[in-house]
Regions:
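C-terminal alpha-helical cap of glycosyltransferases
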Residues: 345-395
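Aromatic "clamp/platform" in nucleotide-sugar-dependent glycosyltransferases that forms part
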Residues: 223
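A charged, aromatic-enriched C-terminal amphipathic alpha-helix characteristic of glycosyltransferases
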Residues: 304-312, 325-357
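Nucleotide-activated donor-binding/catalytic signature segment of Leloir-type glycosyltransferases, i.e.
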Residues: 33, 178-206
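A short, active-site helix/loop in glycosyltransferases that binds the activated sugar's phosphate group
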Residues: 52-91, 96-108, 183
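Conserved donor-binding/catalytic core segment of Leloir-type glycosyltransferases
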Residues: 123-141, 147-150, 167
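Extended catalytic core of nucleotide-activated donor transferases of GT-like folds
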Residues: 1-61, 70
Length: 397
């Protein structure tokens, strides 16, 4: 009733929604009534393949699908099939404000305070190399694997060097949706040389920028990840990233084909999680999944769980460590340059411009739905995933 009243009294031009479609099931139930008057725009993302055919009804219920990742755009098109021709489907990646997240150097007006912040963070310890993880403590984010892989990295470089390294985890250390990270730390980490610090309090944006600048690399090794905002924020702060190649994280690594073109996806090449292409942006340390298995639940019956091995993550951390501070800084600034570029469109300004363009296009394309349809009934069509699940092939343009 509230939506009906809002449309009648306020007369909006459109309804814009975002996040998981299951949050909007109640709205999709009345989509015909709404779309006889105004369009529905959806800024959407989906974590992984196989294409979620169980989302088809949701995607059909909107007029504009703004896909946050390249993978999501492909999923929207694959799931909709012939219905896609009636939609506006565009790639609109997340954008970060470069005035909020930026590199801090000696010219920063509060550089002395930044040095004090870093000193307090490590409780007086002399730390030369910092790994940062900023995410929720939930199973798909693999927080325990983060600690295990960091411990393995420390063993790879030796105890004396490891004493001057640190892992910072900005998260709730104990969460029923994840695990008890204090217990994981105690079990895996010898405190004499493995330094793991937790940042559990909510922080303002300016404080988060300080944390990103303390780090040498930000890592995210989720087994399902629609985008991975901490990576984009880290890149905007001029820092390198380490990622599991899945979901929208692979967009941020900017994998390129043999012609140097930023890769795109289709039914024959739905993802790069099988390591079809390995060359990526200088700012990224990419770790490919060692295992792809199917997870699911009644509302979402199937989805790939793309897990990378802690050993591979540890090796990638060692590679970043051995680059040295000057090379890490150069590569991190290359990442910032790219997220600010017209190619990536990952700045807040570029994202806003893309949203405006897409909304304008959708308004031009919008045709109000009729009050009813006459549907000729027949046998239920076979419903199965038609894109490749193995042996991906890439089409060069």
């Amino acid at each position: 009733m509230l939506v009906r009243k809002l449309i009648k009294e306020e007369k909006p031009d459109a309804i814009l929604i975002f996040t998981d479609p299951r949050y909007w099931a109640w709205l999709f139930d009345m989509e015909r009534e709404i779309r006889t008057k105004i369009p529905i725009f959806y800024l959407n993302i989906w974590d992984d393949y196989p294409s979620p055919l169980y989302n088809r009804g949701y995607y059909r219920s909107v007029d504009l699908l703004m896909a946050i990742s390249k993978q999501t755009k492909n999923i929207n098109e694959l799931v909709l099939g012939d219905y896609a021709k009636d939609k506006v489907i565009e790639y609109v990646p997340h954008g970060i404000n470069e005035d909020f997240f930026f590199p801090i150097d000696e010219n920063y007006e509060a550089f002395d305070k930044f040095k004090d912040f870093k000193k307090d963070l490590f409780k007086g310890k002399e730390i030369d190399f910092v790994v940062f993880w900023n995410s929720r403590n939930i199973h798909r984010k693999r927080p325990a694997d983060v600690i295990l892989s960091y411990r393995m990295f420390c063993d790879m470089i030796g105890e004396e060097k490891a004493k001057k390294c640190a892992l910072i985890m900005h998260t709730q250390p104990s969460d029923n949706n994840g695990t008890d990270l204090h217990a994981v730390k105690e079990a895996f980490c010898d405190p004499s040389y493995v330094n793991v610090f937790f940042s559990a309090e909510p922080l303002q944006t300016a404080q988060m920028n300080l944390l990103y600048n303390v780090a040498d690399v930000t890592m995210l090794i989720s087994s399902n990840e629609g985008w991975g905002l901490s990576l984009t924020e880290s890149m905007m702060a001029g820092k390198m990233i380490l990622l599991n190649v899945t979901g929208g994280m692979q967009d941020q690594a900017r994998f390129e084909d043999d012609n140097g073109k930023w890769i795109d996806f289709d039914a024959n090449f739905p993802s790069n999680h099988r390591a079809t292409f390995k060359k990526c942006g200088e700012w990224a340390a990419a770790v490919f999944p060692s295992n792809l298995s199917i997870a699911g639940s009644p509302p979402t019956p199937y989805i790939y769980d793309d897990r990378c091995s802690p050993e591979d993550v540890a090796a990638a951390l060692k590679w970043v460590y051995e680059l040295g501070p000057e090379e890490r800084e150069r590569r991190g600034l290359k990442g910032r340059e790219w997220v600010l570029s017209e190619e990536s469109n990952m700045s807040a300004k570029n994202m806003a411009s893309r949203v405006i363009e897409c909304c304008d296009k959708a308004f031009e394309n919008f045709t109000p739905r009729p009050s009813y349809d006459l549907i000729e009934t027949g046998p239920r069509p076979v419903n199965y995933v038609k894109h490749k699940l193995i042996d991906y092939t890439y089409s060069y343009e």
